[in-house]
């Protein structure tokens, strides 16, 4: 499956050979002090720098050392922008091939497996994640997630180690791989009769996957806290007042332990950052809905959620927010109903 999917990915997402570094690529590679080995930065120092090569006290909160390791390695060979873009396309094809294998292991239907890989390789959720150089973080994070799904087919004694390694790989590629922590155990619960029809042991496999994914998350946070000691956000550095409810105090303590670097509030880059919570949720639901429609009907592509593509909404209830909420709720509920039936 890898070869034909690679051809399709190349046809759909390859930029012109004369392409240059555009938008964030200039900051990620040309101005990245780690990639350019400025200031005596060693190869291993990626663990002490953020995605843009900045130290903890200047970071915007993106801790992704694995893409930096890859960039530094390839940068020593070539600085040609087309090459750095092209291997991103090939990684996307590799993800599609791996998803094809996972689908076949689950269904034993070759045609359906090829269809899943074809849909995945042709309908990237974000074109920027495949055709843009900085999208390597998304692609590698996706590789970790799909590899974790593939690990569920391993014997019970080996599966936790595979899930642990895959989730850890995804987390060090991009923070959004955090979604694997709850989703992979859920997938283990659902897929156990398909991957191990003679001895499904749903609860045991799901618990093992949860322990493995949770251990990967804890190790990731502890290593990031030690290797990348970023400043504590002001809202977390301030102690909670006396009488704070236990649930809120527990959430505060969890966020302090997680120690996410302060995120920038730039309305031009992310207009939802200055919106209140209800309007932020409504705007996020609209982003989700538009992303889904762009996958199926890519008439007008929006590279990201920055202004003016996705300005903060002026009301809470509108078609985009309602459709986004419906598409978040209905597919899981429908899948659950089909599973029970």
Q: Model regions: which residues?
A:
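Polytopic membrane enzymes that build or remodel cell-surface glycoconjugates and lipids
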Residues: 1-341
């Amino acid at each position: 499956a890898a070869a034909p999917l690679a051809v399709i990915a190349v046809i759909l997402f390859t930029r012109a050979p004369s392409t240059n570094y555009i938008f964030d690529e200039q900051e990620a590679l040309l101005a990245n002090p780690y990639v350019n080995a400025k200031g005596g930065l060693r190869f291993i120092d990626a663990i002490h720098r953020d995605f843009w090569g900045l130290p903890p006290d200047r970071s915007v909160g993106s801790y992704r050392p694995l893409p930096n390791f890859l960039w530094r390695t390839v940068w020593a060979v070539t600085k040609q922008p087309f090459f750095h873009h092209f291997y991103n396309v090939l990684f996307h094809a590799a993800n599609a091939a791996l998803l094809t294998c996972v689908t076949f292991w689950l269904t034993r239907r070759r045609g359906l497996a090829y269809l899943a890989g074809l849909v995945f390789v042709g309908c990237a959720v974000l074109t920027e994640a495949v055709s843009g150089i900085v999208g390597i973080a998304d692609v590698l994070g996706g590789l970790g997630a799909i590899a974790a799904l593939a690990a569920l087919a391993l014997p019970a004694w080996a599966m936790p180690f595979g899930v642990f390694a895959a989730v850890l790989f995804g987390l060090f590629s991009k923070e959004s791989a955090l979604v694997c922590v709850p989703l992979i155990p859920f997938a283990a619960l659902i897929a156990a009769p398909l991957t191990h029809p003679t001895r499904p042991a749903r609860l045991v496999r799901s618990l093992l996957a949860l322990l493995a994914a949770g251990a990967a998350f804890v190790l990731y946070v502890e290593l990031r806290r030690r290797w990348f000691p970023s400043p504590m956000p002001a809202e977390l550095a301030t102690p909670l007042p006396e009488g704070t409810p236990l649930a809120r105090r527990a959430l505060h303590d969890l966020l302090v332990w997680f120690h996410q670097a302060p995120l920038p509030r730039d309305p031009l880059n992310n207009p939802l950052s200055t919106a209140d919570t209800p309007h932020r949720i409504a705007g996020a639901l609209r982003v989700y809905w538009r992303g889904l429609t762009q996958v199926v009907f890519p008439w007008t592509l929006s590279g990201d959620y920055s202004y003016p593509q996705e300005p903060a909404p002026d009301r809470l209830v509108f078609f985009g927010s309602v459709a986004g909420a419906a598409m978040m709720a209905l597919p899981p509920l429908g899948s659950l109903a089909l599973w029970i039936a």
